[in-house]
Structure formats: C-alpha cells, structure tokens
Amino acid sequence: MTDIWKPSVTVAAIIERDGRFLLVEEETSDGICFNQPAGHLDPDESLEQAVVRETLEETAHDFSPTALVGMYMSRYVSSRTSLEVTYLRFAFTGKLGAVHDRPLDQGILRTVWMSYAELIACQHRHRSPLVLKCVEDYLKGQRAPLSLLYTHPTAIGAMHA
C-alpha cells in the first residue's frame, strides 16, 4: 500500500494593537526568524483550541479568536536539510487577554510588536512568506466567521474519554 500524503496542519494568531502586530522571535533550524504566534494542531483539539494554546505557550498571553483571517497552503524546503514540508495554515484574529508570568515555549526568544512597515523591512527574517500574507489579508479586512469551522466531538477526544 502506498503512503497517503498529508500536509502539516498549523494555526496562527494575527494580533494587532495600535497599528502594530504581535510576533515572536524564534530559533529555527534555518536560524532566528520572526513569526506570528503559531504552531501545530495537536491530537484531540479543535483549530480554535490550538490557536489559543499556541498563543499562550509562545507569548504568555490569553487569546480569544473572533474570526478566521484565512486558510493558506505553502511548501517549506529547509535550506539546511532540503527536507520538504507542505503546511496548511489556519490564521485567526481575536482579542489578546491577560499576560501570565510563565516561561515562553522552547525556542521562543521573545515577543515583538511590529508595524506593517517594519514587517516589510524584515521579510528576509520571516519564518515563511505567510507571515506577511496573513497580515496583508488582515489589513484588507478579510474575515470569516468562526462558524465556518466545525469540529465534530469525535475529533476532540470525546471518543477517548
């Protein structure tokens, strides 16, 4: 039997405050990069739960998603290993909540607030081209209701309880 190809599903939080966007500076196999708070969908969680968790882990902030900015697919090829991965990214916007006194996720160096102009100026340090694309879509007012996404209870662990 042939293996079935599967993309890597990720989530990202597009968080804007006073014309600036919340990013993380992180260590990657290709060097230090900027990214939105983002990460992989874990087993037994919804996409919304994943973006809440990733934002907390990477920024120490609570996050409440209010809309889906977009769904994006891109291919990443490591400059170091030539490994290819296709990502399917779900980008959310929402409300930033309380900050907690907790360490940031492993590999996250710090959080940074950047203007759109600053984001453009440092594109060479973006984790992927989707960092800028998601912000541009957000700035264009692109939003879809969260009701567009449906997670059946069997996908979030109800069958495992």
Task: Tell me what each language-model feature is.
Residues 31, 73-75:
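Generic structural signal for helix capping and beta-alpha/helix-loop junctions
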Residues 68-71:
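Residue-level recognition of beta-strand microenvironments
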Residues 8, 16, 36, 63, ...:
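Short connector loops at helix/strand junctions that flank enzyme active sites
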Residues 41-64, 75-129, 160-161:
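Unchanged
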Residues 17-57, 153:
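Conserved Nudix-box catalytic region and its N-terminal flanking loop in Nudix hydrolases
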Residues 4, 29-31, 36, 99, ...:
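Residue-level signal for pocket-adjacent positions within structured domains
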Residues 1-22, 40:
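Conserved N-terminal beta-strand and adjoining loop/helix that marks the start
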